[in-house]
Amino acid sequence: MSFLSNFFKKENKDFNMSQPSELETYFQQFRKNIVGIGHTFQSPFGEKEIIYTDWTASGRFYRPIEEKILNEFGPFIANTHTETSITGSAMTMAYHKARNIIKQHVNASKDDVLIADGAGMTGVVNKFQRILGLKVSENLKNHTTVPDELRPIVFISHMEHHSNQTSWLETIANVEIIPCQDSGLICFDSFEKLLIKYKDRPIKIASVTACSNVTGIRTNYYKMAKIIHQHGGLCFVDFACSAPYVHIDMHPKDEESYLDAIFFSPHKFLGGPGSSGVLVFNKKLYKNLIPDNPGGGTVNYTNPWGDHDYVDDIETREDGGTPGFLQTIKTALSIQLKEKMGVENIIEREHEINKIVFEKLTKIPNLNILAAQHTDRLGIFSFYIKNVHFNLIVKLLNDRFGVQTRGGCSCAGTYGHFLLHVDQQTSKGIEKKILEGCMVERPGWIRMSIHPTITNNEVLYVCESIKQVAENYEEWAKDYTYNSIKNEYIHNTANPIEIELVNKWFESNNQ
């Protein structure tokens, strides 16, 4: 804590190291094993401790998980698809056990199948769309005609990540954004009107986020599931943002509120980086004779004359080639860690932290928190400083304070239009300039996202850092030059340490 205490002493701030709450103390047993805690780097303004507040983008390595994979799983690493040798058999069993742990965690039924693929939710939602037969090759689009009355209709919220919006726009489906209330929440009356409007469509899908990755606002996806099921539709839920922190239950007590499919990104879990995306869906949705990735492990028999028979089991059929068994094992281990921390503890601790953040940031005169009226949220705060480029703020927080945040639209550009009140004419003007190579007017914000393992003193430090940047950005900006091509701010004299750092990482990889 020396970096933090020295900072406040230097700035003559009244900073008493607070006594940790019971929950803060509870989470310290997990905090001490996070790789990177206390790590420093050399900034243009001296040595800084990394204060990580970018959890919505990625989780962090957890040392016991990395050591377990290395020391316990490692000696038995081998390809799966065999139960004869000890190594192959052990890995095959470990892979299947990991899959079962994931299924149990989301309360999947015997009729639900699991597919792990890609690097996160983006990979599995695109795979799911192909499995559903909703994707047509770009080269064939001009030769494919689907009458409007036969096109699936997909309903999304205004809060979606690009992966749960643009991916649907590239299918044969029509996509409708469900209108929101003045409060910024989904309007269910409007949703029901849309369902009536499209009542004759053969396939009706609601694909919605469980939680905004911009504001931390959670959606009532069970209510949405119940409504669309009553209209003969399907409900898919994107848990990419919230999966590390909340209960996931595909089959709640209200039978009409079941979820037909879910997807999430385990790399966002503590301990999860390096894992695959996860998709779980009801097998009734699978109508395919040919797997999405035909290959090793998907066939029962082939011969030289072109005959081939695919396996019947859906999970095996859609797991072509060598599966990502280590990625799936890591997902299971990070889920077990989440369960050990306890969802109730996680949520309650985040409420403690959120209270501090709101109290401190709302006092900064030139700072605006997006959707600030919604205080019941996960620990995600997106904000902007009036008339200041978001990436300048991110850079100053990094260089002067070591605070890791993220600037931009958080891959939620459509939601940004709602939050920043960007009308269509203004949007078109911005788009035109972006296409011409001018990025400076691209809308965005600064996002900080916390984890229950962060300490109160770190939270106070982050908030004080933001306050100082908001007060001093004009003077501090003189140290930087704006790069319009990269839309980034570059320090005028200091060499980027990242180049030397990364080159050093790869120098001794074989030693």
Q: Model regions: which residues?
A:
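Pyridoxal 5′-phosphate
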Residues: 2-511
